[in-house]
Amino acid sequence: MGKRNKKVTQGKRAYNDKSEIVLENKQFEGYYKKQNLFRGKPNDEFDSFMEYMRKPLPTTFRICGYRHHAFELKNHFEKYYVPSLKNVVHEGQTIPPPTVLPWYPDGLAYIVDAQKDVIRKSPPLKRLQRFLVSENEAGNINRQEAVSMLPPLFLDVEPHHVILDMCAAPGSKTAQLIEAVYKKANIKDAAHDSKNLKSVEGLVIANDADPKRAQMLVHQINRLNSPNILVVNHDASTMPNIYVKGSSPSDGLNVIEEKKILKFDRILADVPCSGDGTFRKNLSLWREWSANSAFSLHPLQLRILIRGLQLLKVGGCLVYSTCSINPIENEAVVTAALKATGGAVSLVDVSKKLPLLKRDPGLLSWKVLDDSLNEFQSPAENTNDKIELTESMWPLPEEEMSKLHIERCARLYPHMQNTGGFFVAVLQKTDPINSRSFDPKKYTASMEILPPENKRQRTEKGVDEASNSTLTKSGNSYFDEEPFVYINPDDTSIKTIVDFYGIDPSFPRDQFFVRNQSGIPVRSIYFACSLFKEIIEANTNRVKFVHGGVRFFVKQEISQLLKDFSLKANKDICNFRIHSNGVNIISPFLNEKHFYDAGLKDLKILVKNEYPHVEQFSESGMLKKEFEKMPLGCNILRVDAQTKDGALMDMLILQPIWRSPTSCNLMLARKEKQNLSLELFGMDV
C-alpha cells in the first residue's frame, strides 16, 4: 500500500491535526453493506464495524522473542512501566495501562489503547515513549500494528527454510520472519549464541519493487545484525529466478558445474492493496476511498500471487495477505490463483492456529460494484473506459467455491479485537504448476504464459550459460548498487585479522566480503551465511542485490603516537577493529586474551565520555585493574549487568573498546550509546 502523508483530525474535527476530515463516507458504507460482510450475524454487527473504523488505532508492539533477554525485558516492562501507566488521563480521557495481546505467542506483544501522537505528546506517557523509541532502535522491540504480526505467525518457519518476502518494505514482517527462524533453532540471539548459527541453514530474501522502499528495509535489518538476510529490488510480479549450485555430474574427465533454480520453502506475499482496512490510521482514506481502486490492483495482486506460487517448493507454504477488506483484492485473487494452478495448490485450514485470535471465514460470494455502486454480472457489462474488469473478479459457482474451501481464508475486522482490518490466506503447493494451463485473457491481460516448471528448470541452464560469458566476477556491476565481492581467505588483510584476534579455524573465513568493485578491503568487511554467498556468486548481474550481511571489521586509522607506543611495547596493533554490529557473532571464535571485564560504573563512564582518561575510572573498579594488561588497539569489553548492581535488567554486554596509551573509548555511535544507556540505566547519562 502506498504511503499516505496527509494529516487530518477526528470527529467532525479530526484527532491528530488541524485540517478537517469528516469520518464518514456513504459510498464506503453502501459498498460494504451490499457485500453483506457479516452474513448470519446480528444486524448491529455492521454498526459495530463502522464504529471502530472511526476510532483511533491503538499502539502495539512486540518484544523480539529470540533475543537472549526477551523475557527479562518483558518482566522489566511489566514491573517498571505498566504500574506507572495506571490512571493516566489525557485531555479528559482515561488511557488504560498496556495489556498483553492475548493471541500472540508467549505473551510478548502489547497493546496501548492510545495512538502514537498521544503517547508522544502526553507528559505521563513520556517515559513509555522513551522506552519504545530506545528499545525499537536497539532491535529489542518492534512497533508494529497488531494484525501486521499475523502473516509470519501463519508461515511456521523452520531454521533450514529459505524464505521469500515478496513485498517486504518497511520490513517489520521481514524482521519477524528471521526472529522466528532463530527462535525455532533455539538461538536466543544471533548476537549471543553465534556458535549455534551453524544450525540455521536458511535465509530470508526480502524484496521490494520500489528502490527507496527497499532501502527502508536496510534499517530494520541492521538492527537485527543477522547474517541470514538478503535484500533485493525487483517487481514482485516478475521476480527473476534465483540460481544456486546444482548437482555436478562428471563426464569422466571434467566436473560440469550446473545451476538450479532456487525454490522457496516459505513465501510471504503481503501485496500492495487499497488499504481500506487502515482507515483508523490513514484518515485521508475517508475522503479518498474508491471502489474502483480494487479493479486496478486485482491484476497486479494476482500476478504477484501466481509468481509466488511458481517460486514455491512443492510442499511449501505461501501466505497471501492484504490490509484491505475488499473481496476483489482478497477472495477473488485467491480463487483465481487456485483455479489457474489447476489443483496444484490448496488452501490450508488455520482455524485452530492462534486459538485466541478472533476471525471470520472467507466470503464465498460477493458483488462486483463500481464507485456508483452499480453491479456488474460480467466483464461484458462494463461500459466505463476508466475501469477494466476481468472474469477473475467474480466468485465461481457456489459448489466450486466450496470445493476450493475459500472459507479457510481469514478475515479480521476492527471491532473484533480493536485492530485494523486484515485478510490472510495460507496456501500449500502439493504439485508442480503446469503454467501452460494459464489463460491470460481469462485472468488478466498482462499475465505472461510460462512453460511448465519442469521444462523451465531444464531450459534455463542454457540461457544462464550464454549470459554468463559477458559477466564479471563481481556481483551486481550491472546495477547501481555497490557489488558484493568475496575476499580470498588468503588475502593479507584477512590473514592479519585472523592472526591478531586468534579467530578459531572452525569459523568460515571464506564468507567475508566487501562492497566495492576492486574486492580489496579498504574500509569495511562484512560476513553472511553460506547460502547468501552461493546466491551472490551464482546470480551476477541478474538479480539486483541491495543489502545484506553484518559488518564485522572496520579499518581504523592508527595515530603516530599509538604506533610509537606499540613499537616501544614490541606489540602489534591490528588496523582493523571489530565493529559493534558483528562483535557478538564473532566473539565465541576469538582468543580469550581480547576480552576484558568491567563493571556498570565503568560502563557508565565510557557511555558518558569520549576517550575517558584512565584516571577517571575508580581504583576499585575492574576496568582500571585490567587497563594495564589490555593491549593497545581494539579489545572487547565484557560487562555482566545485574539488577542487584543497579542495572534495570540482567544482561551480558559485549562491545568493542579501543585502548590508547592513557585512555580508552567505547566504539559505539552516539545513538547506540544513548540506547544502551536507556536500556541499562533508564536515562541518557
Swiss-Prot record:
GO MF term list: mRNA (cytidine-5-)-methyltransferase activity; tRNA (cytidine-5-)-methyltransferase activity; tRNA binding
Places the protein is found: Nucleus
Catalysed transformations (reactions): cytidine(49) in tRNA precursor + S-adenosyl-L-methionine = 5-methylcytidine(49) in tRNA precursor + S-adenosyl-L-homocysteine + H(+); cytidine(50) in tRNA + S-adenosyl-L-methionine = 5-methylcytidine(50) in tRNA + S-adenosyl-L-homocysteine + H(+); cytidine(60) in tRNA(Asp) + S-adenosyl-L-methionine = 5-methylcytidine(60) in tRNA(Asp) + S-adenosyl-L-homocysteine + H(+); cytidine(61) in tRNA(Asp) + S-adenosyl-L-methionine = 5-methylcytidine(61) in tRNA(Asp) + S-adenosyl-L-homocysteine + H(+)
Keywords noted in UniProt: Methyltransferase, Nucleus, RNA-binding, S-adenosyl-L-methionine, Transferase, tRNA processing, tRNA-binding
Gene3D superfamilies: Vaccinia Virus protein VP39
GO cellular component, one term: nucleus
Entry binding sites for S-adenosyl-L-methionine: C167, A168, A169, P170, G171, S172, K173, D208, D235, D270
PROSITE patterns in the record: NOL1_NOP2_SUN, SAM_MT_RSMB_NOP
Knockout consequences: Cells lacking both trm4a and trm4b show a mild resistance to calcium chloride.
E.C. numbers: 2.1.1.-
Coiled coil (UniProt feature): none
Keyword Methyltransferase: yes
Record carries keyword tRNA processing: yes
GO biological process: tRNA methylation; tRNA wobble base cytosine methylation
Catalytic residues of the enzyme: C323 (nucleophile)
The protein's role, per its UniProt record: tRNA cytosine C(5)-methyltransferase that methylates cytosine to 5-methylcytosine (m5C) in tRNAs at position 49 and 50. Trm4a and trm4b methylate different sets of tRNAs. Also methylates cytosine to m5C at positions (60, 61 and 62) in tRNA(Asp).
Family according to the record: Belongs to the class I-like SAM-binding methyltransferase superfamily. RsmB/NOP family. TRM4 subfamily.
Protein name, per record: Multisite-specific tRNA:(cytosine-C(5))-methyltransferase trm4b
Origin species: Schizosaccharomyces pombe (strain 972 / ATCC 24843)
Gene that this sequence comes from: trm4b
